Amino acid sequence: MKTQRFLLLILFTALLLVFTGCSQSPEAKESPKEKAQTQKVSSASASKKNDLPTIKILATGGTIAGKSKTSTTEYKAGVVGVESLIEAVPEMKDIANVSGEQVVNVGSTNIDNKTLLKLGKRVSKLLSSKDVNGIVVTHGTDTLEETAYFLNLTVKSDKPIVVVGSMRPSTAISADGPSNLYNAVKVAGAHEAKGKGTLVVLNDRIASARYVTKTNTTATDTFKSEEMGYIGTIADDIYFHNEITRKHTKDSEFSISSLDKLPQVDILYGYQNDGSYLFDAAVKAGAKGIVFAGSGNGSLSDAAEKGAVRAVKKGVTVVRSTRTGDGVVTSNGDYVKNDLLASNSLNPQKARILLMLALTKTDDPRKIQDYFNEY
Ligand code: ASP
């Protein structure tokens, strides 16, 4: 009898243990704090796909963030925020983990040196994190090449940096922004895009910031790299077909980490009957450097040359570029003797970017000419 009661007790205890063990869920065994952490981790891992690259989109405004009724020329640039840009292209989530930051929201004619420095520092900071694989900057097309070249010279990273814009506002029929943005994210997440410096992606083409320029006021195929060529194409897949021969990004000598301003560099344009007073006015207004968009191979009229030489004598660095839109400006003759430097193949607006950065390091004309030959 005693043994029977003892066996029954053991059976009852065993049943109780089994029952309580089964009914207790794993969560019930955790403290509320642990439970919250578990949920957070699992919800994060549900939305984040670990095998996809992590891309940050830094938005600055422009037509890609513009709105109109249906017009492609009358619209307000820089009104749509970065979250709306991302929401408009949900397909991006299949190719990358994307998130956005609004740096500024302006038409690109209002991008100034302060914004360049802010953007450059932010891109550098983000890329220094092991959690970020690439950066996309959305930007107005008017001065896009200047910002792209600035990043090309100042961000010390070999991770992809892609600058993108659009020629039609987000509300236009057949807006080009969504597909350009999708392609930009695709390129920024591509392993093959590493080490190529800052890239510009529009209209299914990949261009180097060093070589590309805007060539047409309104057409969607406005960004061209006539002389040097595009470096790649996007036809669903990415096809790279050219290498960059100029120094950039992690091989660049220019650093902005401790800068809060850039030296004033102005651009003057050469034309028939121009005068030397243009140079005097720039010097008086505080220019430390002047880029001259000369005719042909960076030529100056006699009057302009007098003004340029006067500026050089006052310690201002003068660089000859060209208004032709393409080709190399060579160092030759009296121009060299008078320390009028040559922009090599940089157009005036990009020569200004390089000259600003060069002047943060030196005012030696020979050294600055070397920079123009190397970058
Ligand atoms: N005006 C515009 C801008 O540069 C043009 C564009 O984005 O295409 O912001």
Model region roles, listed by residue range:
Residues 1-10:
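Bacterial N-terminal signal peptides that target proteins for export
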Residues 20-21:
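C-terminal motif of bacterial Sec signal peptides marking the signal peptidase cleavage site
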Residues 34-35, 39-124, 306:
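ATP/NTP phosphate-donor binding region
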Residues 43-44, 49, 277, 302-375:
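ATP/nucleoside-binding phosphotransfer catalytic cores, i.e., glycine-rich phosphate-binding loops
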Residues 52, 58, 65-68, 81, ...:
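Accessory alpha-helical/coil subdomains and C-terminal extensions
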Residues 137-159, 300-309:
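Short Gly/Thr/Asp-enriched flexible loops that form oxyanion-binding sites at enzyme active sites
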Residues 148-178, 185-189, 313-322:
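Short, acidic/small-residue loops that bind anionic groups at enzyme active sites
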Residues 164-235:
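Internal gly/pro-rich beta-alpha loop/helix module
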